[in-house]
Amino acid sequence: MDNHSAGFGKTLLRIRKNKQYSQQYMAENKIHQSTYSKMERDLIEPTLGNYRHLLSRLDMSDEELQYIMNDYNHSEKEQLLTAFMNLSFNDVPLLQEIREKALKYLDVHTDYIITDIVHLTDALIILAITGDIADARKHVRPVWKRLEKLDGWYLVELRMINAMLFLFPIDEAILISGTALAQIQKYVNHPFAGKIAVSLRHNLCLLL
């Protein structure tokens, strides 16, 4: 699995020992003993099926394991996304800082969401400094142009839509939020989705 670092095996070994689980317990007759041993020594990476099995045996989510593997921190991308979603949208210095970090990230990676963040920080900086919402909306349009073509929205897209909803004209914001709330219904049992839904409704009420 290419998305996991070379330290997966060492992390797996450390967690297993901390939990006082045996290799036999982890493998549970689903993974050959020799295969499991090679994974802990970072000689091979797990298949997707084995990876999911190991997460289940560790009683962990993928997010928690990745957090541990990254020295108990979020990835660079997740840090950018979290910083953007949590900031005060009139904090120009912080907006500029996030924008610069996003541009540096894009020097190394091709990433649609981080590109969206650059556009949105541009829009928010303009709005905070000049109050010109028409000019700010020009920077939002490329983001919406990409998102509206998608066959479905997932949590990260829904978070982006929520972040920029107040920049749309009211009639468009009503339509977009309605579509977004319908998409969120698919996540009815997901704890984070409820927060997005509440925030979407709150932001829409502020526009009305």
Where would I find each of the regions flagged by the language model?
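Alpha-helical residues within helix-turn-helix
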Residues: R14, Q24-Y25, H53
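Conserved binding/catalytic microenvironments
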Residues: V108-L208
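Short alpha-helical DNA-recognition segment
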Residues: K19-K38
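Residues that mark the N-terminal boundary/hinge immediately upstream of a DNA-recognition element
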Residues: T11, S22, T47-N50
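Residue-level detection of the helix-turn-helix DNA-binding "recognition helix"
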Residues: K17, I31-H32, R41-L43, N70
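Short, charged recognition helix plus adjacent turn
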Residues: Y67-L94
